[in-house]
UniProtKB/Swiss-Prot annotation:
<comment type="subunit">
    <text>PSII is composed of 1 copy each of membrane proteins PsbA, PsbB, PsbC, PsbD, PsbE, PsbF, PsbH, PsbI, PsbJ, PsbK, PsbL, PsbM, PsbT, PsbX, PsbY, PsbZ, Psb30/Ycf12, at least 3 peripheral proteins of the oxygen-evolving complex and a large number of cofactors. It forms dimeric complexes.</text>
</comment>
<dbReference type="GO" id="GO:0009539">
    <property type="term" value="C:photosystem II reaction center"/>
</dbReference>
<dbReference type="GO" id="GO:0015979">
    <property type="term" value="P:photosynthesis"/>
</dbReference>
<keyword id="KW-0150">Chloroplast</keyword>
<dbReference type="GO" id="GO:0009535">
    <property type="term" value="C:chloroplast thylakoid membrane"/>
</dbReference>
<dbReference type="InterPro" id="IPR037266">
    <property type="entry name" value="PSII_PsbL_sf"/>
</dbReference>
<dbReference type="Pfam" id="PF02419">
    <property type="entry name" value="PsbL"/>
</dbReference>
<feature type="transmembrane region" description="Helical">
    <location>
        <begin position="17"/>
        <end position="37"/>
    </location>
</feature>
<keyword id="KW-0812">Transmembrane</keyword>
<keyword id="KW-0472">Membrane</keyword>
<keyword id="KW-0934">Plastid</keyword>
<keyword id="KW-0674">Reaction center</keyword>
<keyword id="KW-0602">Photosynthesis</keyword>
<protein>
    <recommendedName>
        <fullName>Photosystem II reaction center protein L</fullName>
    </recommendedName>
</protein>
<comment type="function">
    <text>One of the components of the core complex of photosystem II (PSII). PSII is a light-driven water:plastoquinone oxidoreductase that uses light energy to abstract electrons from H(2)O, generating O(2) and a proton gradient subsequently used for ATP formation. It consists of a core antenna complex that captures photons, and an electron transfer chain that converts photonic excitation into a charge separation. This subunit is found at the monomer-monomer interface and is required for correct PSII assembly and/or dimerization.</text>
</comment>
<keyword id="KW-0604">Photosystem II</keyword>
<comment type="similarity">
    <text>Belongs to the PsbL family.</text>
</comment>
């Protein structure tokens, strides 16, 4: 049995964590803008 390329799996993991980080920053930006403008 041949295992999948571990480098490819690492790249996918980094991409997923990057998307989660961008989503978290976006949510925080919305919360802060609501807090400051109200």
């Amino acid at each position: 049995m041949t295992q999948p390329n571990p480098n490819k799996q690492t790249v996918e993991l980094n991409r997923t964590s990057l998307y989660w980080g961008l989503l978290l920053i976006f949510v925080l930006a919305v919360l802060f803008s609501n807090y400051f403008f109200n």
